[in-house]
Amino acid sequence: MLKWALIFFVISIIAGFFGFSGVSAATATIARVLFGIALVIFLIFLVLALMAGQAIL
């Protein structure tokens, strides 16, 4: 349990560093792009799964 507390403490320190520095604006843009890509891939796989499910029936 202490191990997880230390891991999350380190993550929070790193997140705080990025939040209070100028890096956060650049990383927010990258995060938005990656989220958009992940959303598109999810929708593609969702459509493919629905089409495969209908092909079985």
From Swiss-Prot:
InterPro entries membership: DUF1328 (IPR009760)
Protein topology in the membrane: Multi-pass membrane protein
A GO CC term assigned to this protein in UniProt: plasma membrane
Keyword Manganese tagged: no
Spans through the membrane: 4-24, 33-53
Record keyword Ribonucleoprotein present: no
Pfam families tied to this protein: DUF1328
Superkingdom, taxonomy of origin: Bacteria
Keywords: Cell membrane, Membrane, Transmembrane, Transmembrane helix
Subcellular localization(s) per the UniProt record: Cell membrane
Family of this protein: Belongs to the UPF0391 family.
The name this protein goes by in its record: UPF0391 membrane protein RL4195
Organism: Rhizobium johnstonii (strain DSM 114642 / LMG 32736 / 3841)
